[in-house]
Amino acid sequence: MAIIDRLSSSQGLRTQDANKALASEILISQNFEAIDELKNLLTNPPDQKVLFDVLKTLEIIGEANPKMIGHLFEEFIPILSHKKNMVVWIAMSALSHITVFHPQRTFELLGTILQIMDEGSVITRDKGFVMLVGLYTEAAYRPDVKALIVEQLLKAPDNQFGQYVEKWMKVISAEDVPALIDTLEQRLPDLTSPSHQKRAHKNLKKLMRA
């Protein structure tokens, strides 16, 4: 059966079950021929439903085994300008799994990524932040990306702030810990939810002990 026939929309399904099953099968069998078929559908989708299914399947594969879709970085980029936000955030999610393989290209695309983060949904912003943190791990880009991460933390919605802080904490260099402490201290007075305040204080204590 052709890959396109395995997709959820081709089977008349509204759930992601078929896409998940296909992704799982490709992962287990390490089927790069199937990846090539998905690539062709990604660049020349017959309709938007197929595009969505292909993106979702590749995103699932990328989350489990980024190397399997690492070579598709450039194919995802044109999709970032798609008119449907759901399509954009799945493309961003897929890209966030493979940023590590393409740091220079990701750095070149920061303007686009930041614009999408500002204009898109919460999920889009989340995936963009993951990309920033991934790029931060590359020493050559760290100073520039550090400033962008701080900027994102200062304007992050309260309910996203804690998880963003913790994502950066996982990879932060010792020399940048003071910058994160300062950012936490700046945001703390503005956090109105007790749970958000508690989380911020907890992270602040961890950083101060580091």
Functional labels for PLM-detected ranges:
Residues M1-L7, S29-L42, P66-I79, P103-I116, ...:
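Amphipathic alpha-helical scaffolding segments comprising HEAT/armadillo-like alpha-solenoid repeats
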Residues A21-L22, K49-G62, E74, I90-H97:
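Non-membrane alpha-helical segments in proteins
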Residues L135-T137, Y141-R142, K146-S195:
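Extended alpha-helical scaffolding segments
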Residues E59, S96, V133-G134, E166-V171, ...:
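Structural signature of alpha-helical solenoid repeat scaffolds
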Residues A18-L22, V54, A91, G128, ...:
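Conserved hydrophobic register position within alpha-solenoid helical repeats
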